[in-house]
């Protein structure tokens, strides 16, 4: 599995994955799009701007949009890495949001996606990474715990875990 920034060449597989999320009415944490007016090429441009901190909406921070892909290039899920925390992110969303397309859940992709995302936090010198999940999401909780998450507290139904990213 590979976690990387989406490219123009990934359009078909990413759109297919987005359609699967929409059809199943499944949450797509770590992947953000306007279902009414979505244009893939504009989404790629917006992702680049968000990473550089350009044209950020109020209360947003610079972030990197990733997509995970299997060995044949099929899109598996999203991961969004926020490069710093504001109050809302500190209380609810954390540094990383991620999700795996419904048909590929339960196969270890969420753990691998989060592990690769944590390697990026290390490269970005984020030593303690906040990852959150709903109290009603035992699968995400298990992934976070398996990657070293330590529960700090629960706020309004959101479990907040810190993961220490060691320098090697």
Task: State what each model feature region is.
Residues 1-95, 156-168:
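GNAT-family acyltransferases
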Residues 2, 97, 130-132:
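Short aromatic/hydrophobic contact patches that present stacked aromatics
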Residues 73, 88, 105-106, 136:
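Glycine-/small-residue-rich active-site loops that bind phosphorylated ligands and cofactors
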Residues 97-100, 106-123, 141-146:
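Conserved acetyl-CoA-binding loop-helix of GNAT-fold acetyltransferases
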Residues 121-132:
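Conserved GNAT acetyl-CoA-binding A-motif
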Residues 131-141:
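Conserved beta-strand-loop-alpha-helix junction that forms the acyl-donor binding cleft
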Residues 132, 145, 150-163:
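Conserved catalytic-core motifs of GNAT/GCN5-like acyltransferases
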